[in-house]
């Protein structure tokens, strides 16, 4: 795992999927996510042959619970990953399309650097960021 961590830092684009234990996967995914700028930017999906579970990559963040300052992007992208998995698993193209639209909305929000949460250098709340993402999504539909 130590060599893998070094390679992630040096050349993260060489990786697509890493198969490892839960503990090492948690460590490596946190490392990779921090390279993007924040734990709040990565989606997380645990998927098997028949079941999948989406969750925020950063965990529950109980230290900021109820303060309206958490970055919602991780959970939103996790939900998009679940829609994509379900769409492909059940051959429902609209679910895959919805996933792609959510991804595009997040990309636009980050490109415009509007309505960012504190972890990304902004001042927006969780609710404000989510509302802005919804508005972007509405314009893409």
Regions found by a protein language model. Name each.
Residues 92-97, 101-141:
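Glycine-rich phosphate/pyrophosphate-binding loop and the adjoining helix
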Residues 1-6:
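Short acidic loop-to-helix transition motifs that present clustered carboxylates
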Residues 7-112:
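Glycine-rich phosphate/nucleotide-binding loop
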